[in-house]
Amino acid sequence: MQGVVGVYSGDNAIQKALNNLYGVQHRGQESAGMTAAGGNSMRTWKGKGLVSNVCRDLFRSFMHPDDYVVIGCASGENADKIALPPLEYESDRFKFSLALDGHVQNRGSRLNEEVVGSLIMEKLRGGTGIEVAIRETMRELPNAYFSMVAALLDKDERRSELVAVRDAHGVRPLYLAMNEDELFVASESAPIDVMESMGQGIEQRQDIAPGSLVRRSDEGLTERKLVEPQHAHCAFEWVYFGRPDSVMEGRNVHSVRKRLGQALVETHSLRAAYGGPRKDVVVIPIPDSGRSVCVGVAEALGVTADEGVIKNAYLGRTYIIDDPEFRRIASDLKHNTIRDTVRGKKVIITDDSIVRGTVSESVAKNLIKVGAEEVDYLVSYAPIYYPCFSDPPDKHLAAAPYEGCSLAEIGELVAHSLPSIKEVRYNSPENVIDAIGLPRERLCTYCITGENPLVKTRAPEITMHDSSPED
């Protein structure tokens, strides 16, 4: 996963891009980078680490008054320093730098940007315009999905432009905001909100439609539909990936997670067992994505919600670690408990998912150690049976062996494999879809249903006129 941003502005574009890049840091912590373009130059700087380590100080030495276009990314992919995004490509006439959030299947050890960027540049070198080059690349990669930002420099015309593209399925989010003179693009709406609260003028804001391209240069703004949309928005964006203050496809992430918590209470008739007011029951979240779910559960039950597990924000995601022992140690280091919150109480934990079960068991075991009477685990997502397209196919999933069982049976079987947890309760796929509030056919729920929207059909093309390389 990756957070991407793009800015077209004649007023300190680099600083504005950097501010927005901080706002998508949660989408990737392995590396960061930025590309600035203007006049007849393009410069990229990148490195391993967080945005604050890589970009905060270095960018000042790259600033140039002609820089109208800046893109940036915070990447979660572990790659060699040389191959970190954004990646630059060059022909006799064009320079092109891109960063994308998504996945290209069968790419081997190459970055997503290497596959997409090389195809686009190959077409630019052949005299194809940028819009047709991107459309043809999307056609050649029918099962890929990506939200892309790019800086394009035409050396002959001494003109730079910002390009933003979202694939036909819209699996990953991409948001834009603009005024008469500026265009801002980001993976999520939250950094745009922050920018506006700091005094940035915004006249229009919206999701970039699936299958669409947006361009901004000194010649103005262009919006184009490249292929017909075939909506398949990743349901896990609302459950885990997205910031709670972001709005995706018109649905606020925090509100969706609250509804998921309320659905758990209704589905499993939890009021009879835990309904308040009771002083011996407390609902605590696994930070951060469990917090909004915790609010929904506590409100529905009428019991206290509190903080009982504290996360070390400087340790990365533990579920991506393959070695079980290293994963357990990392989880123990990442989470600590607040004794006063849980001692002598029945603890209800809210979490977005149980992937392997390592974190769940580690946290529950520590809660019991410090005095919790029992630990029940409420999972806002449905049981995960299939690894995402971007995950290794042999990834261990706690619920995978129990596909076909009822929700109650799956909860019992998973709880049996986690000795410190008394009960595990999941939402159903239907609950997840209802909480998001989009039609089922507009969501990708492959990991919980096995329905793969990316291989049903190829997106129909839009007829386009390609009269010059500038098109």
Where would I find each of the regions flagged by the language model?
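PRPP-dependent phosphoribosyltransferase catalytic core
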Residues: 159, 173, 205, 227, ...
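Generic beta-strand/beta-sheet core signal
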Residues: 99, 151, 165, 177, ...
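Secondary-structure transition/capping motifs at alpha-helix termini
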Residues: 126, 270-279, 300-306, 340-343, ...
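Short, glycine/charge-rich flexible loops or terminal/linker lids adjacent to PRPP-binding catalytic cores
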Residues: 299-347, 357-361, 385-395
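Flexible loop/turn segments at secondary-structure boundaries
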Residues: 14, 78, 106, 171-172, ...
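Conserved short alpha-helical segments that host acidic/polar catalytic motifs at enzyme active sites
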Residues: 1-208, 215-281, 286
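A conserved beta-strand->alpha-helix junction
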Residues: 114-119, 304-316, 417-436
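Phosphate/diphosphate-binding loops
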Residues: 200-203, 211, 262, 266-268, ...
